[in-house]
């Protein structure tokens, strides 16, 4: 009784809200984003102060009219006005408190952690060696799986990942002051929205019209009858489709031994729109040994390609090193002419062997340029031989 008297005294001291204040509070109630939660065992709606300030700054009261100044010009003016609304019991300030686990649950978890830690240490030593071998295979499979999953559409049986949110509760704040920021305020003012009023009025009219069904004209009664039958058939057909698609999936799954997963109208029971529930027409997945073998073959081919590329790079490096070391193994500078002639003769012989091997005959196909080179080389050799014989004969004569 004493609390009620105090509450009445506060209302009398503050005074009743004006029409303008009611209009501002109503606009804020239906346009400011709100969330619902539990407070003291009751379901309440709350809003954040910063969003309320932004909402009022975008309202019609923030724009100046002809002959009148704007009610809200800055954030500070909005905060002052919201303090007036708070004092007139349109909303009140609340404190957000995070929910904590009970001490018993914490102790149980600690005891379980100690008992499991000893067992896990033994298992870890055994599993580490096995995991190292599996990690390489799993990484390759994940890459292939991610590519396939991106192409596939979501089936109705696949569970969606839920985002974990921290739970909290609201408690009344001791300091009832409106502050701009992330402060939480709970709504007390709860007017009836125009939409709810209109919907209620339509519902009342529909009930009265249904009770007067015998007084309707014959044509209207027949039309309503056919409409109701058509709506009932449509609902029944959707239910039958949902049952039939499950039966079809089970039949195909049993016949193929769980390898083929065929869904007719996979999004029929999904949380999507009316049109999206009828597309795609079907989805098919193959989950058998061949799919696993193909993945393994792909991974093996990739490994072989990598090893071949590494071997080629190593062989090329060796050839480059041999090519650099070859000129260091040659003789002195004085034998440069003889080496040049040897290399020329070797090249000619290689060219002849290539021509003969390419044609597959015993006859050698030689171009004009090669014939001229051979004749020039033979003439040079004969001249060298003659020059060598002349000094020998002169020496014998002496």
UniProtKB/Swiss-Prot annotation:
Classification of source organism: Eukaryota, Metazoa, Chordata, Craniata, Vertebrata
Transmembrane parts of this sequence: 197-217, 235-255
The record's subcellular location field reads:
Endoplasmic reticulum membrane
Q: Which residues carry this modification: Phosphoserine?
A: 335, 341, 353, 356
Which portions of the chain have biased composition (kind: Acidic residues)? 372-387
Topology in the membrane? Multi-pass membrane protein
Q: Provide Lumenal-side residue ranges.
A: 218-234
Q: Which InterPro entries match?
A: Sec62
Renumbered to this chain, region (Disordered) spans 106-167, 289-398
Q: Please verify whether the record's keywords include Protein transport.
A: yes
Q: How does it assemble?
A: The ER translocon complex that consists of channel-forming core components SEC61A1, SEC61B and SEC61G and different auxiliary components such as SEC62 and SEC63. Interacts with SEC61B.
Q: Which residues point to the Cytoplasmic side?
A: 1-196, 256-398
What is any one of the record's Gene Ontology cellular component terms?
A: endoplasmic reticulum membrane
Protein name (database record)? Translocation protein SEC62
Q: Which GO biological process annotations does it have?
A: post-translational protein targeting to endoplasmic reticulum membrane; post-translational protein targeting to membrane, translocation
Q: Which residues carry this modification: Phosphothreonine?
A: 158, 375
What function does this protein fulfil? Mediates post-translational transport of precursor polypeptides across endoplasmic reticulum (ER). Proposed to act as a targeting receptor for small presecretory proteins containing short and apolar signal peptides. Targets and properly positions newly synthesized presecretory proteins into the SEC61 channel-forming translocon complex, triggering channel opening for polypeptide translocation to the ER lumen.
Classification via Pfam families: Sec62
Where is this protein primarily located?
endoplasmic reticulum
Keywords on record: Endoplasmic reticulum, Membrane, Phosphoprotein, Protein transport, Translocation, Transmembrane, Transmembrane helix, Transport
Name the PANTHER family on file. TRANSLOCATION PROTEIN SEC62
Into which family does the record put it? Answer: Belongs to the SEC62 family.
User: Which spans does this entry mark as compositional bias, Basic and acidic residues?
Assistant: 106-155, 289-324, 330-354, 388-398
């Amino acid at each position: 009784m004493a609390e009620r008297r105090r509450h009445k005294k506060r209302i009398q001291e503050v005074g009743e809200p004006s029409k303008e204040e009611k209009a501002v509070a109503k606009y804020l109630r239906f346009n400011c984003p709100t969330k619902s939660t539990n407070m003291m065992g009751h379901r309440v709606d709350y809003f954040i102060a910063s969003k309320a300030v932004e909402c009022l700054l975008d309202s019609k009261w923030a724009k100046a009219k002809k002959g009148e100044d704007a009610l809200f010009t800055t954030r500070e003016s909005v905060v002052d006005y919201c303090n007036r609304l708070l004092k007139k019991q349109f909303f009140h300030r609340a404190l957000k408190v995070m929910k904590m686990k009970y001490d018993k649950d914490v102790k149980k978890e600690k005891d379980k952690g100690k008992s499991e830690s000893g067992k896990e240490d033994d298992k870890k030593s055994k599993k580490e060696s096995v995991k190292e071998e599996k990690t390489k295979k799993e990484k390759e499979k994940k890459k292939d799986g991610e590519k396939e999953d991106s192409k596939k559409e979501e089936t109705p049986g696949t569970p969606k990942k839920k985002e974990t949110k921290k739970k909290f509760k609201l408690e009344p704040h001791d300091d009832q002051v409106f502050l701009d920021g992330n402060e939480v305020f709970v709504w007390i003012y709860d007017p009836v929205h125009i939409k709810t009023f209109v919907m209620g009025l339509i519902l009342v009219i529909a009930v009265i019209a249904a009770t007067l069904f015998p007084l309707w004209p014959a044509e209207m009664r027949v039309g309503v009858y056919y409409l109701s039958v058509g709506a009932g058939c449509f609902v029944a057909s959707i239910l039958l489709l949902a049952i039939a698609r499950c039966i079809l999936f089970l039949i195909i799954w049993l016949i193929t031994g769980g390898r083929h997963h065929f869904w007719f109208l996979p999004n029929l029971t999904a949380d999507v729109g009316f049109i999206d529930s009828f597309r795609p027409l079907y989805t098919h997945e193959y989950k058998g040994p061949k799919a696993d073998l193909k993945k393994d073959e792909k991974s093996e081919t990739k490994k072989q390609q990598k090893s071949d590329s590494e071997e080629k790079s190593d062989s090329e490096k060796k050839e480059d090193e041999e090519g650099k070391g070859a000129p260091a193994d040659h003789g002195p500078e004085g034998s440069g002419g003889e080496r040049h002639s040897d290399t020329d003769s070797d090249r000619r012989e290689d060219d002849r062997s290539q021509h003969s091997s390419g044609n597959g005959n015993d006859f050698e196909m030689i171009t004009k340029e090669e014939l001229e080179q051979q004749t020039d080389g033979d003439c040079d050799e004969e001249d060298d031989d003659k020059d060598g014989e002349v000094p020998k004969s002169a020496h014998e004569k002496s």
